[in-house]
């Protein structure tokens, strides 16, 4: 497997600078926070009360670590990351810049006048071991239960994962994909770039599902395989003609079905 060999070899050349001091003097560490003596805490990091930070953790500058967060051993958190209260992060995880984990889920209840009232989001986000989150990833906390990201999941830049989602082990989610609250993704799935997942009621994927780029998934998938719904590009004039034909499919189908059957 040459590609795997390349991946392993490339890690030997990765440069990770070591700061001159373990905890920058501008960092703010709250009461009862338990920070391992091997952890590296960058400039202007805020660590709130009751946080637990494991062995060999690196937190870069301007991060906010909320009350009660637990960060496992050897986690690497890049600059400007926000972990809301009670987030649980496993061992050997990586979170890249600008990601926000544990923000309130998007839940509102309308009244008889069409006004929307917020639903308190009382759960948390639980992230397993060896999870990698790209830059600008947003994962909302659960409404009652937790949002769960299992071991080995890899998430590309600018992905949104809604409240109470559950992503199975070793699933890959590519850039700009988004999933509505309550979505359940099985193990070893591949969600390609720009995929949107959401419909009437929560969507569920079985294990080993691949969804190609720009697909819109509106119903659950219970058979492993590759699924597509995005339309590939074509010359603009041809695309317009095809779009017009698509809008007339119902009419054309009725005409075909209404024709008398030939006797032969």
Please describe what each predicted stretch is:
Residues 2, 124, 249-252:
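Generic structural signal for well-ordered, non-membrane alpha-helical segments
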